[in-house]
Amino acid sequence: MIVIGIDPGLARMGYGVLEVTRGEISAVCYGCIETSGKDLRASERLLKIHTEVGILFEKYQPAHLSLEKLFFTRNISSAMGVSEVRGIILLAAEQRKIPVAEYTPNQVKQAITGSGRADKRQMQEMIKRLLRLTEIPTPDDAADALSIALCHIHIMR
């Protein structure tokens, strides 16, 4: 079973692809889709994200998508961009009938470390350990996406 986790963002959207085989969880791939506000209009940035997410979905055929929920933020401009990206991702998933689960950052932290108050470094170390990686996944957005996918797998069990 393949689960894709996504940490939505307009400038940099993290993704992580995990596979569960006979109870074992492994990282298939992870990375980021980046768009630049300097080079692209907002609509072009959203189209790039939609296209690249579609390619991920077609390549890995996920059984589930897990997505970070938007939480309160003081930067309304950033929140609007993230909301637009979330809409694009939800659309791409619905077009392919991929079930979507959404988690808050605290839910993800609780599922991965047992504490909703874990810091970024603790989360990254746990992801490295739980997925038996040789190093902490980078950039941070990709590590966050792996943790969102892993959270979903733990909650499904």
Locate predicted features.
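Phosphate- and other anionic-substrate recognition elements at nucleic-acid/protein interfaces
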Residues: M1-R157
